[in-house]
């Protein structure tokens, strides 16, 4: 029988682990978004419809970053459908989960939720059917102060006048 020996030195550091490795994601699967972090009209929710109990737990866990939309939902996600007044957002078939997505929780709500949860934002983009131009347009919407098509769209649709400063996009 061969023997092996290992020495562990708790003071020997090879590098720092990026805190974002401990991040998470949220997607419209089951009750993860609707009823999980967002529930309009519930006594458990704040004035924006965000579940206060969930926000408190996410802050307590110190989740460093959350990707939205996570999982398979991104395969049919059109971020443009998820911005602006909720009553004007189109309802679309969500083919991955076989439901109708009303887009009441979208990009703008996620950005607000992330601020309240004290976590960073990572947006996922649908490169499978939409391509890299979608990522460029999303960055323009989120990060430009104004004077461009998508930044002016943000300024005309919602209360977020300052850019989000979106730094990370996943594909």
Model-predicted regions and their roles:
Residues 19-125:
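Active-site-adjacent substrate/metal-binding segments within catalytic domains
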Residues 11, 124-128:
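Short strand-loop junctions, especially beta-strand C-caps/beta-turns
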Residues 13-15, 56-57, 112-113, 157, ...:
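Surface-exposed acidic, glycine-flexible loop patches that form ligand/cofactor-binding
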Residues 97-99, 144-148:
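Conserved helix-loop functional segments at active or binding sites
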Residues 2-14:
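N-terminal module-boundary/linker segments of secreted carbohydrate-active enzymes
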Residues 61-70, 129-146:
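Carboxylate/His-rich catalytic cores and anion/metal-binding grooves
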Residues 158-171:
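Single conserved hydrophobic/aromatic residue that forms the stacking wall/gate
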Residues 146-161:
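Short mixed-charge
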């Amino acid at each position: 029988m061969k023997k092996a020996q290992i020495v562990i030195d708790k003071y020997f550091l090879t590098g720092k682990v990026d805190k974002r490795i401990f991040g998470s994601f949220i997607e419209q699967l089951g009750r993860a978004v609707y009823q999980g972090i967002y529930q309009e009209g519930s006594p458990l929710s704040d004035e924006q419809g965000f579940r206060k109990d969930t926000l408190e737990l996410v802050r307590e866990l110190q989740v460093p970053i959350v990707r939205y939309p996570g999982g398979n939902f991104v395969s049919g996600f059109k971020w443009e459908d998820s911005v602006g007044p909720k009553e004007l957002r189109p309802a679309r078939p969500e083919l991955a989960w076989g439901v109708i997505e009303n887009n009441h929780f979208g990009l703008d709500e996620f950005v607000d939720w992330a601020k309240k949860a004290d976590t960073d934002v990572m947006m996922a983009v649908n490169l499978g059917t939409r391509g890299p131009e979608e990522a460029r347009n999303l960055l323009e919407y989120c990060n430009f102060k104004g004077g461009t098509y998508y930044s002016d769209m943000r300024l005309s649709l919602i209360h977020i006048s300052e850019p989000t400063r979106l730094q990370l996009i996943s594909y």
